[in-house]
């Protein structure tokens, strides 16, 4: 929504790690060295858009397959692999160099773009994020319970914040925004207000 309102492209970096995880699971890979080698050999193309983005791997749009519970259960492990992060960050920076883009991810302000014009650390409680995810998934995955998703969200938070490379943390110059009580539209409005405060008139 934010990118669309600003007329910017949108890049969900988490989708890139999910795509790598999907490919690793499809190939039955577990060893970090093998996953790194696979990642380096992938022909990955990201197509940012104003409302959504697509991840193309070896000519196939894998976007519809990367939000499954199986991928969610392994993405933190795969994204913690140094070689995988190095490859993905390089792609993300190339996209950012084009300008006019909103990057969404857990290490953007600290690792990918430490000199970004505006940094917002978006957060909400584990329960709130799990409930949102549950509502997204319940139609396609009725076997999942809210408790399962909440446990998975908490596990991912722990793993991402304790990994050695690019851990999840708020950049010192990032603005903290808790959107636990905000709608999607309200969150976008709050982020635009933050941007306007730093660069008056930029969104007009």
Residue ranges of model-derived segments:
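Active-site signature of alpha/beta-hydrolase-fold catalytic machinery across serine-
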Residues: 1
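N-terminal phosphate/diphosphate-binding loop that engages ATP/GTP or pyrophosphate donors
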Residues: 4-69
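Hydrophobic "anchor" residues on beta-strands that sit immediately upstream
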Residues: 8, 54, 100, 174-175
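Hydrophobic/aromatic beta-strand patches that form the interior of the parallel beta-sheet core
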Residues: 11, 118-120, 175-177
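Residue-level signal for inorganic ion chemistry
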Residues: 14, 59, 88, 102, ...
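Small-molecule kinase domains that catalyze NTP-dependent phosphoryl transfer to phosphate-bearing small molecules
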Residues: 47-49, 85, 92-98, 110-111, ...
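ATP-dependent NMP and nucleoside kinases share a basic, alpha-helical "lid"
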Residues: 63-140
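Generic C-terminal helix-cap and adjacent flexible tail
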Residues: 193-204
């Amino acid at each position: 929504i934010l990118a669309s309102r600003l007329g910017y492209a949108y890049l969900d970096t988490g989708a890139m790690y999910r795509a790598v995880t999907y490919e690793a699971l499809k190939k039955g890979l577990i060893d970090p060295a093998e996953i790194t080698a696979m990642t380096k050999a992938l022909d990955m193309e990201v197509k940012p858009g104003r409302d959504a983005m697509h991840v193309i791997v070896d000519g196939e749009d894998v976007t519809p397959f990367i939000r499954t519970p199986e991928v969610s259960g392994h993405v933190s492990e795969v994204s913690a692999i140094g070689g995988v992060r190095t490859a993905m960050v390089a792609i993300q920076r190339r996209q950012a160099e084009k300008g006019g883009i909103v990057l969404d991810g857990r290490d953007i302000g600290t690792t990918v773009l430490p000199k970004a014009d505006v940094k917002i650390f978006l957060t909400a409680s584990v329960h709130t994020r799990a409930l949102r995810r549950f509502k997204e998934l319940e139609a396609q995955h009725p076997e999942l319970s809210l408790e399962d998703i909440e446990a998975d969200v908490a596990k991912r938070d722990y793993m991402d914040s304790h990994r050695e490379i690019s851990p999840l943390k708020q950049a010192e110059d990032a603005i903290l925004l808790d959107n636990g009580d905000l709608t999607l539209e309200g969150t976008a409005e709050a982020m635009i207000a933050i941007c306007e405060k730093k660069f008056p008139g930029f969104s007009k």
